[in-house]
Each structure stands twice: as structure tokens, then as C-alpha cells.
């Protein structure tokens, strides 16, 4: 992905903010600190490869955003998209708010649990989630949003196949599993047309 100098500078500022804040608040795992660019920035950026090409989706919601991963990275790369970031933990929410202000991102941030965010508040979205919940629970959490036409782009680790099989015991859904560009054992799962069995 080619990016402008301005975008690259924003990503670098964000990366440095993340590393500095991580000294006081557990935002990212200690083992990933030395490889933040690939492990977090690039990993999050690849979600954009799977955003719908049509103009029906002009916003995304990052649920359980944590350090703003992937939401902040996606917003920096695609500033024209409306961004909703949901994080209930105050310290993590505060970090996201600080990054939003310092980088002039104009994101809408909610210090709230996602189950309290109604589709009527944020509309139809691309739903992003990274390292949040098993797929079965994730679909339960987001089901009301799928009912209004949202789609999901979920980062999943090495147990992705098991998660899909478990989710299929309770849910009917269409999905595509794309090999992660940063870890060939992980997948980016694109989910839509979710129904209860």
C-alpha cells in the first residue's frame, strides 16, 4: 500500500504515542513492542483490503478498540471514512481520545460497552474487531448491527477454523477467510448475512 508522507508521519506519531503510553497502561503485549510496525500497524492496515468497494459503507465501528487497533490505523489511512471507536476501559479510552485530538482524526469515540451501542446510533457499518472475542460470541454481540446490513471484518488467530465451526453451531452466515499478510497462520474473516439458527 502506497501512502503519502503525511500519512506515514501520522502513523509514526501514533506508533510513538502507543509505545510511550504502554509504559504506564497495558495497551499492547510486551513481546510485540520491538515489532510494533509489522505486528500492529501493518496487521491492522490490511483490514482495508476487504472494505466493500461500493459506497453503501461510508463508516466503520471498531469494537473493543483497546489502543485504537485497528480503528486509528484505518482512520489515518482512509481519513474520509467516518470512524466510531468503542472502548469501555477508561485508560484505553483516554489514550484513544488523546490520539484523536493530537492527530486531528475527527473520530467519534464512545466510553461504553458495545452491547449498549444501538444500530440507530451509528447506522450501517463495517464492524472491525481484533483480538476481542471468539467468533461465536462476537456474532452474538454484533447481531443487531448485522440485521441492519452491517458487515464484519475480524482479525482471527491460529484457531480461526475452530472458531468458525463453533460459530456455525449457533449461527448461519456467509464468510471469506483471507490469509493474513503478517502471519500465514492467521486470517482476516469477512462476515455477512448473519442469521440465528
In which residue ranges do the predicted regions lie?
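Conserved SAM-binding loop of SAM-dependent methyltransferases across substrates and taxa
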Residues: 67-80
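A structural micro-motif
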Residues: 58, 81, 105-107, 150, ...
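Active-site capping/gating segments
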Residues: 109, 159-197
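Conserved S-adenosyl-L-methionine
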Residues: 62-66
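Conserved beta-strand signature within the Rossmann-like core of class I S-adenosyl-L-methionine
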Residues: 149-160
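Class I SAM-dependent transferase core
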Residues: 1-57, 61, 91-105
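Conserved beta-strand positions in the Rossmann-like core of class I SAM-dependent methyltransferases
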Residues: 61, 84, 153
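Conserved nucleotide-cofactor-binding alpha/beta core module
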Residues: 77-145, 158
Amino acid at each position: 500500500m502506497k501512502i503519502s508522507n503525511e500519512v506515514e508521519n501520522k502513523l509514526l506519531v501514533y506508533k510513538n504515542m502507543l509505545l510511550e503510553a504502554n509504559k504506564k497502561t497495558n495497551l499492547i503485549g510486551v513481546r510485540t513492542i520491538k515489532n510494533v510496525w509489522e505486528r500492529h500497524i501493518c496487521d491492522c492496515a490490511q483490514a482495508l483490503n476487504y472494505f466493500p468497494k461500493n459506497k453503501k459503507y461510508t463508516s466503520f465501528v471498531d469494537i473493543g478498540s483497546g489502543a485504537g487497533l485497528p480503528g486509528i490505523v484505518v482512520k489515518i489511512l482512509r481519513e474520509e471514512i467516518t470512524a466510531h471507536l468503542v472502548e469501555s476501559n477508561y485508560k484505553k479510552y483516554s489514550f484513544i481520545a488523546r490520539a484523536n485530538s493530537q492527530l486531528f482524526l475527527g473520530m467519534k469515540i464512545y466510553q461504553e460497552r458495545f452491547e449498549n451501542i444501538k444500530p440507530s446510533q451509528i447506522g450501517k457499518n463495517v464492524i472491525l474487531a481484533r483480538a476481542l472475542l471468539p467468533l461465536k460470541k462476537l456474532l452474538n454481540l454484533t447481531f443487531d448491527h448485522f440485521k441492519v446490513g452491517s458487515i464484519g471484518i475480524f482479525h482471527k488467530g491460529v484457531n480461526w477454523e475452530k472458531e468458525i465451526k463453533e460459530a456455525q453451531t449457533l449461527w448461519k452466515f456467509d464468510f471469506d477467510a483471507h490469509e493474513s499478510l503478517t502471519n500465514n497462520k492467521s486470517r482476516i474473516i469477512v462476515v455477512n448475512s448473519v442469521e440465528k439458527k
